[in-house]
């Protein structure tokens, strides 16, 4: 959409610079102006619709991050590839409300899922006795949102995290 808008503006600039030679009666210029105005309205409408859907999806959880599953069961490496292909991320809750939103997905499906914990995480939700490196080098969340050490070879629910910066 932005590419079309920018292309239209470029054409508009060309016509403004060479207007009389290329478009003596101004019909092409007026058509371009109308087209650019139409694209601007369409872009504003799409942005508004997107923000409405995003706010609705994040309303119940209070989290600006969305946690979505495709209902597949995969190991950590497969999860990484799936989330990357979907232009998402492996879940990495940074706040309690984000962890709750993530846990809501797990609870609905009655399954555990992988997450990643950053080295500088201010928020953690480790279960009692965790982290336990003997259990594995990956981390999984249970249906209550508690974190546990896990083997990266375990097959768990695929959940990807999506967030939007506007």
UniProtKB/Swiss-Prot annotation:
Q: Which GO terms describe its cellular component?
A: extracellular region
Task: Show the GO MF annotations.
Answer: carbohydrate binding; phospholipase A2 inhibitor activity
Decide whether keyword Signal is in the record: yes
Q: Which Pfam families is this protein grouped with?
A: Lectin_C (PF00059)
Q: In which tissues is it expressed?
A: Expressed by the liver.
Its subunit composition reads: Homotrimer; non-covalently linked.
Could you identify this protein by its name? Phospholipase A2 inhibitor clone 08
The species this protein belongs to is Bothrops moojeni (Lance-headed viper)
């Amino acid at each position: 959409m932005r590419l079309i808008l920018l292309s239209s503006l470029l054409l508009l600039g060309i016509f403004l610079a060479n207007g009389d030679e290329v478009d003596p009666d101004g019909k092409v210029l007026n058509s371009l102006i109308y087209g650019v105005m139409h694209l601007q309205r369409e872009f504003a409408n799409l942005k508004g619709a997107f923000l409405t859907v995003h706010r609705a999806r994040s309303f119940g959880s209070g989290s600006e991050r969305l946690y979505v599953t495709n209902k597949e069961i995969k190991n950590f490496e497969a999860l990484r590839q799936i989330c990357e292909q979907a232009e998402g991320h492996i879940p990495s809750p940074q706040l309690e409300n984000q962890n709750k939103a993530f846990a809501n997905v797990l609870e609905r499906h009655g399954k555990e899922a992988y997450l990643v914990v950053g080295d500088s995480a201010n928020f953690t939700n480790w279960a009692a006795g965790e982290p336990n490196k003997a259990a594995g080098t990956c981390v999984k969340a249970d249906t209550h949102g508690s974190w546990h050490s896990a083997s990266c070879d375990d097959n768990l629910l695929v959940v990807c995290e999506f967030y939007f910066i506007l």
